[in-house]
């Protein structure tokens, strides 16, 4: 088959460094992956092309790149999958990380986030002389986050990191969950307290991008939601994120639908005047245009609200 690649390149040593695209048209076997095609280009067409790869078997996580605007491991992405009709395949370096050259990014940003969550066991007691035996059922819950290969695809896809590079990010938070949920670790409370701060677990916008691009099914966003549950179960409820959850649940349980005005007020805090004033005009314009339900005492119950309330009550009784 004939493959068409459009590679975004960058040479820091050029007279005028800057990103540009370069097209390659090559003949390759039908079974080739995007990585196979890139290696073919580097070996036979253009030895100046820089890329990072190693195992070529979806194990090491080295070859994460952006293919047609989606973060992927290029070693497991077949050309026929992304270009079934011979379309041009756009290959770019990962997003949200500094490009060193061509398709190679600086991973210091990624590893800095991982180090920030202290990704190692901190036993609650003295280190045992023998093996620390953990219950099977406790460890089964950790199989998913332990499958992470640190490829960084989720970091590349994270929409929060695009606008706020202080956010810990999906990979680091998924790794944090792996130790918070480990019964052998003795610092769960301190870990949760740290993750409860700004740029931690509450800054995720639940866009699902990290879930979609993860090649190992770790589903970082779901791990972040479990961290939020653990934070609240640990009694840390005096944050905007925790208040947002409680206000949302209270509104739907009592009226059958969301009181968006009180959600904002409760989340920021009724006495947080600067935040409330900063959002007042937005709320007013939304209300005038009919896009905001009547707030507070004017927020009427929906028909069937009692049934919704019973669902909430039944769920709470099971907890």
Q: What is each model feature region?
A:
Residues 6-8, 27, 76, 90-94:
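Residues in well-ordered beta-strands of folded domains
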Residues 71-84:
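Structured interaction patches on ligand/partner-binding surfaces of diverse proteins
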Residues 22-33:
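Short, contiguous acidic and Ser/Thr-rich linear segments
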Residues 32-47, 89-319:
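Ferredoxin-type iron-sulfur electron-transfer modules in oxidoreductases and energy-metabolism complexes
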Residues 50, 55-64, 249-254:
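Short, structured protein-protein interaction patches enriched in aromatics and acidic/basic residues
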Residues 1-24:
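Eukaryote-biased recognition of intrinsically disordered, low-complexity regulatory segments
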Residues 27, 67-70:
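Short strand-turn-strand beta-turns centered on an Asx-Gly dipeptide
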